């Protein structure tokens, strides 16, 4: 009888794809996949080790699932960034863990299970710079109508606060034809929205083709029959070209949405972070985006409490956010991570002050977001239906301006039944801080 396996994926969408590949490999080798951890013989926890909060979440989940060894569970395997980061130390600190699989070793998951079933406790790290293996299968775990596509792995940016290059290796683009093929397979399975992800999507192609190819990739993806929305996440501001802006503007399938994690606006702090841009360049880029794509939704993320961030720097950041009025904003407190240059900087900001600054900016953004959402009242927008919440009358969905998990939702009332995965026109009638409410317009659905 085949072993049953449960995979728990923590952290970002890029990590989720690694988990989906492990599921594909296990399925290919005849393992029984289960969504119920209590019924599993083997549990794989695909961990995040990016910042302190993510490490704590991963450790807590490992300990929680380790309790199942009192019952049916035979093996507990830790994969992903936490395993890559701490390797043998993790195995020594957590006796309930049977094996560690690094970010360069998940393709060996079957071998790891075989060896641990023989009583060995092993560490399978692998090569974090290995080329992307296009032959590995993948089982999609997101909603059937929406899927992530990882267009590269690794990172060459070396921001001083970030451990990712040490966990994921150098930047490695996938071949364009393989990405197109994956998109077509997803479309054949009913996917309507694809979300392009990487540590840096704007760098796509430079290592393979000696030029940036994100715009060309978007144009090719838009030719895939069945795909209706193409969304781009994780764009570095200094890499957003006029060509990319023109593609977002002119390609009907590319969502009028862009995610640009700027991290700060103070040129002093940006230099300390080793970010290759300045406040003036960020402002110029945002003005160019708004001018060329008038209805574009801009998401960004900010780090507060970076070492050396003075009250003056923070006030500059606050004024910047008030002035720019981002459509979507995530604010994170700086996490002092061992092995990063920023961890050695003087003037580390106290935790209480970091949290206070985060709260101030999120309250500011809440007001900005509400005012922006109110502008949608009376407008008709396209909404991708994601869930039925009241039988045949009320639904949850997302607009082109909302990425899954991180952005808002649209509450939709309908006089006719709608299907999950359907894109419908919705007239917006009310607005909340982050969400919209509206009524379906049924003569134009697809």
Swiss-Prot record:
GO terms for cellular component: cytosol. Its EC number is 2.8.4.4. Residues 374-442 form the TRAM domain. Keywords: 4Fe-4S, Cytoplasm, Iron, Iron-sulfur, Metal-binding, S-adenosyl-L-methionine, Transferase. Residues 141-371 form the Radical SAM core domain. Its cofactor is [4Fe-4S] cluster. It catalyses: L-aspartate(89)-[ribosomal protein uS12]-hydrogen + (sulfur carrier)-SH + AH2 + 2 S-adenosyl-L-methionine = 3-methylsulfanyl-L-aspartate(89)-[ribosomal protein uS12]-hydrogen + (sulfur carrier)-H + 5'-deoxyadenosine + L-methionine + A + S-adenosyl-L-homocysteine + 2 H(+). [4Fe-4S] cluster 2 binds at residues 155, 159, 162. SMART domains: Elp3 (SM00729). Its main location: cytoplasm. GO terms for molecular function: 4 iron, 4 sulfur cluster binding; aspartic acid methylthiotransferase activity; metal ion binding; protein methylthiotransferase activity. [4Fe-4S] cluster 1 binds at residues 12, 48, 81. It is found in: Cytoplasm. Residues 3-118 form the MTTase N-terminal domain. The keyword Cytoplasm applies. Coiled coil: none annotated. PROSITE patterns: MTTASE_N, MTTASE_RADICAL, RADICAL_SAM, TRAM. Binds 2 [4Fe-4S] clusters. One cluster is coordinated with 3 cysteines and an exchangeable S-adenosyl-L-methionine. SUPFAM superfamilies: Radical SAM enzymes. PANTHER family: RIBOSOMAL PROTEIN S12 METHYLTHIOTRANSFERASE RIMO (PTHR43837), RIBOSOMAL PROTEIN US12 METHYLTHIOTRANSFERASE RIMO (PTHR43837:SF1). Belongs to the methylthiotransferase family. RimO subfamily. Catalyzes the methylthiolation of an aspartic acid residue of ribosomal protein uS12. This is Ribosomal protein uS12 methylthiotransferase RimO. It comes from Alkaliphilus metalliredigens (strain QYMF).
